[in-house]
């Protein structure tokens, strides 16, 4: 009897534990609106996205700062789908060192909400058939980094060109879209701390919604160089009249005071 009671007690306790376990909801993982090689980023995998097939190197996502970090990373999805697809508002794509993002029949980087590419490194985005970087009805900023975008279709592109804004700030960019355009389908292009250097004479054409030359969109060899502001440097005349002049241009008689000479000498040393 004692054994029977003991077994019943153990059975009852086991049943109670099982019921408690069943009634306690499992901790659900959080899903984020960003996909890498077709796999959605979650609270479980965001700390190491190299677990996704097609991803190598260091790839992480910080949901607190909405930052996707690539460091010496290769993301290659192969035939179908986008290498990186994002619906996150104000996503930051931080590139450290050199990173390669490639696909075949879709966009290497596809965004539906504003994105800033930054981090001081290099992003090589390549699509064999479609878009290297596709800003679908949204704004794209490239800031303090290097971006090389190439595709047989579109290089860096918006969608309709009605509202999409492309801002390139203190960055170096090369892009080509062999069939459609290197930079196209944008409402505006803003360059800060950099200059469109190739092809010579190319500029943003609002009527074509892209960078154009001679009335046609540039498709190959478009280069934006960092650190050239386009401000002309003043030319100093070597035949300026000798003497001492006021700010109004009147010539003074006598020699320059010693204090003034000392100030000029100091200024020359600083320059």
Where are the model-predicted features located?
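A composition-driven surface/loop motif
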Residues: 27-227
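Serine/threonine-rich, low-complexity intrinsically disordered segments
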Residues: 5, 26, 169, 225, ...
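C-terminal segment of classical bacterial N-terminal signal peptides
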Residues: 17-27
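C-terminal outer-membrane/trafficking sorting elements
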Residues: 232-271
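Generic N-terminal leader/processing signal
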Residues: 6, 17, 98, 259, ...
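A composition/secondary-structure signal for short, hydrophobic, low-basic-content segments
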Residues: 1, 23-25, 246
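Bacterial N-terminal signal peptides that target proteins for export
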Residues: 2-14
């Amino acid at each position: 009897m004692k054994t029977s009671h003991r077994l019943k007690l153990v059975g009852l306790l086991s049943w109670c534990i099982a019921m408690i376990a069943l009634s306690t909801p499992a901790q659900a993982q959080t899903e984020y609106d960003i996909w890498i090689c077709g796999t959605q980023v979650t609270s479980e995998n965001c700390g190491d996205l190299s677990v996704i097939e097609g991803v190598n190197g260091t790839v992480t996502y910080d949901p607190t700062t909405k930052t996707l970090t690539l460091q010496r990373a290769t993301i290659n999805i192969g035939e179908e789908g986008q290498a990186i697809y994002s619906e996150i508002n104000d996503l930051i794509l931080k590139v450290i060192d050199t990173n390669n993002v490639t696909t075949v029949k879709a966009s290497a980087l596809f965004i539906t909400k504003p994105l800033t590419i930054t981090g001081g490194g290099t992003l090589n985005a390549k699509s064999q058939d479609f878009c290297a970087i596709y800003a679908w009805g949204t704004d794209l900023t490239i800031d303090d980094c290097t971006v090389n975008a190439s595709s047989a279709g579109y290089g860096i592109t918006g969608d309709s060109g009605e509202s999409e804004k492309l801002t390139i700030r203190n960055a170096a960019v090369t892009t080509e879209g062999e069939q459609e355009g290197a930079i196209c389908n944008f409402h505006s292009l803003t360059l800060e701390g950099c200059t469109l250097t190739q092809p010579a004479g190319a500029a943003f054409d609002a009527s074509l919604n892209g960078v154009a030359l001679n009335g046609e969109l540039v498709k190959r060899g478009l280069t934006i160089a960092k650190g050239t502001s386009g401000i002309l440097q003043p030319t100093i005349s070597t035949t300026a009249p000798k003497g001492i002049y006021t700010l109004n241009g009147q010539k003074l008689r006598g020699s320059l005071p010693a204090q003034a000479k000392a100030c000029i000498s100091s200024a020359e040393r600083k320059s």
